[in-house]
Amino acid sequence: MTHGPRPTLRIATYNVHRCRGLDGRTRPDRIAAVISAIDADVVALQEVVGAGPHGGGHAEELGAMLGMGWVMAPARQLRGHSFGNAVLSRFPIAQHLEHDLSWKTCEARRMQRVDIAADSQTLHLYNVHLGTAILERRHQAQKLASIVCDRHVPGPKLVVGDFNEWMRGLATNLLSEKLNSVDLRDYLRIFGRVLESAPPAEAAV
């Protein structure tokens, strides 16, 4: 009995910084152009402006522009809008759970667990944005590892996000003790080549 090649699932993580560029302009369409250029199936986003009194927010806009489903995990309010992490997916989202990673008086942080129904298997994707203080990150890394290692959640798991940490920092070392690390250097080189060949964002509007 022969089996065909295993399907490839392209996953990206992207801190969009409220969709604001270096020019100070808030342009979700430019974020959508980058995501479109890398042709990602699933994208974990951080620092996303969500729904507010006058609109549905950037996660909804990006989902509509890219034709992707989305879920958001607000951590706090920002000028009347929810603010936090979001996940975009071309595949059905089977389940969405949130975990509080906040520590003491530091900025509120939440983690998403998004179960992606990809072909015949479910991928458990964990989207995180760790804090900027070292003790805060240590607490969050320990809690994150405990959540991800829950044996009641079977199947493949992937932790992505903005760790606010060096590759060999305290938080990443703590996580590496419990989880397998993926060497991203080759993928980053590919990503750079894709962006170099992508059309200007202005032309992608």
Q: At which residue positions do the language-model features occur?
A:
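Active-site regions of metal-assisted phosphoester/phosphodiester hydrolases
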Residues: 1-42, 64-65, 69-205
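Active-site neighborhood of divalent metal-dependent phosphoester/pyrophosphate hydrolases
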Residues: 19, 46-52
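Membrane-interface helix caps and helix-loop-helix hairpins in membrane proteins
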Residues: 23, 53-54
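Membrane-embedded segments
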Residues: 51, 57-59
